[in-house]
Amino acid sequence: VAAQQVLKHQRDMLEAAQAAYELGQRMVTVGNWSKLQLSPVQLAASNARMNLRRAQQAAAQAQANLVKTMGQTGLQDGFALPDQLPAIPVQPMTAAELQKRAEAVRSHLPDAESLRNRALSKSAMNVYWAAHALAQDSQGDILKTREFITEETVLHYNGMLKSVWDLLDEVRNQSQATVDAIGAQRDFWIAETDLQWVLQGGEPDSFVSLGGVGGDTPAAAGH
């Protein structure tokens, strides 16, 4: 789901970068710009194309992994994905709540497994809380501020107070902020899944690495 969401916004960024490059080419043709001035715009368009290709590959790989998983569990027929990830909870689970659940699980485990679960629970909780904080920040102040800047840029452009370059740059910035927010949201739900697994006695090989934006961050082994 996250990979498909990211793919859409990578297309938006490429469209804006390509529009800027085409405008720059016209300015070079009529003599208003030099090729040196065009070069950064050309690089931005090339980078946007590369990012789109990465996003396309990530989306295809995520789809293939999902089909494989559904096939292994006998659910390959008739499943459908939502258009977007669910919203993160306003408040994360508390330390007291999680400790109570963790202790209940450990009381049923052999001593060696109980010790491993204690360490895993601490790590899983820390990643969970960090992922929640990052997702809140990226979807809260950061994204809202970027949306405000975009709206103001459009108004200034319509009033001829901003250039088309300013507008195209802001479209790219807005799309990138959205991609980052989707990545943080995805990371939270992976961290939450890892935590729930540990609280059932599971032992993931690793936890999600926070900060990826491409939709292809692997879940812990065993999911």
Predicted features and spans:
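Sec/SRP-type N-terminal targeting helices
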Residues: 11, 36, 40, 104-151, ...
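Short, highly charged low-complexity linear segments
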Residues: 79-85, 147, 166, 206-216
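Amphipathic, soluble alpha/beta structural segments
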Residues: 95, 127, 131-134, 138, ...
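Periplasmic alpha-helical coiled-coil/stalk elements that build and connect Gram-negative outer-membrane
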Residues: 1-103, 131, 173-174
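Soluble, cytosolic/nucleoplasmic coiled-coil alpha-helices used as oligomeric scaffolds and tethers
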Residues: 13, 19-20, 27, 34, ...
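Short, electropositive, low-hydrophobicity segments enriched in small/polar residues
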Residues: 35, 75, 163-164, 205
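Acidic, low-complexity, intrinsically disordered peripheral segments
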Residues: 74, 114-117, 121, 180-223
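Short segments within alpha-helical structural elements
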Residues: 2, 47-72, 145-201
